[in-house]
C-alpha cells in the first residue's frame, strides 16, 4: 500500500478472526509491533483514530474506522504448527504463521520474523487475575475496519484457520473475509 492509501477489511460472515501484519515496504525489518503499540497507547485495545506503530516506534497504519464493537487482540501470537501440535493436530494443519510466509513468498518477500499480529475481531479479554479469556468474536456479518497507511507498506492478512477452539465462533469453522483497497 502506498502512504495515504487505505484498506477496508470486511468480516463477511461475522465471527472470523483476521491476523494482520504490516511491514515497511522499504525495510522489512521494520514492522507493526504489538509490544511497542502497548507502550504507545498505554492500552492493549486499539480504537478508532489510534496510530499503530512499528518496532521503530513510528506510525505505520491508523485505525481509521471500526464498525464492530471494537474488540481486537494485541496479546496472542499468530497460530503456528507448534500450537496445533499442542492441540493434538498433525504437523500440516493450516496456520497463520505459514500463511504469512506463503503470502510474502508469492510476491518475492520474506519476513525476518513472524511478528505478533493485530488479531482483528479476536476477543481476548483479560480476567481479574491477569489471565486471558478465549472469547468468541463480538462482531457481526459485514462489520469492517479501515486501516490507512502512514508510510509505504506491505499488509498481509490471514483468516485464522483455528478450528480446534471456538475463537472463530461456536461452529469452529473458519470463513473467508474480504478486503478493498481505497484511495
Description of each model-found segment:
Residues 1-183:
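Acidic, Ser/Thr/Pro
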Amino acid at each position: 500500500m502506498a502512504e495515504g492509501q487505505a484498506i477496508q477489511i470486511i468480516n463477511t460472515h461475522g465471527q472470523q478472526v483476521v491476523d494482520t501484519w504490516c511491514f515497511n515496504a522499504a525495510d522489512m525489518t521494520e514492522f507493526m509491533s504489538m509490544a511497542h503499540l502497548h507502550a504507545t497507547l498505554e492500552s492493549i485495545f486499539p480504537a478508532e483514530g489510534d496510530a499503530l506503530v512499528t518496532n521503530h516506534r513510528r506510525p505505520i497504519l491508523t485505525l481509521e474506522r471500526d464498525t464492530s464493537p471494537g474488540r481486537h487482540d494485541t496479546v496472542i501470537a499468530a497460530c503456528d504448527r507448534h500450537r496445533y501440535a499442542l492441540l493434538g493436530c498433525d504437523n500440516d494443519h493450516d496456520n497463520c504463521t505459514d500463511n504469512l510466509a506463503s503470502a510474502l513468498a508469492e510476491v518475492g518477500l520474506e519476513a525476518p520474523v513472524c511478528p505478533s499480529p493485530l488479531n482483528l475481531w479476536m476477543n481476548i479479554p483479560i480476567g481479574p487475575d491477569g489471565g486471558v479469556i478465549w472469547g468468541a468474536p463480538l462482531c457481526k456479518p459485514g462489520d469492517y475496519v479501515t486501516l490507512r497507511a502512514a508510510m509505504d507498506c506491505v499488509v498481509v492478512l490471514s483468516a485464522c484457520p483455528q478450528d480446534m477452539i471456538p475463537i472463530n465462533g461456536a461452529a469452529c469453522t473458519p470463513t473467508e473475509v474480504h478486503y478493498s483497497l481505497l484511495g
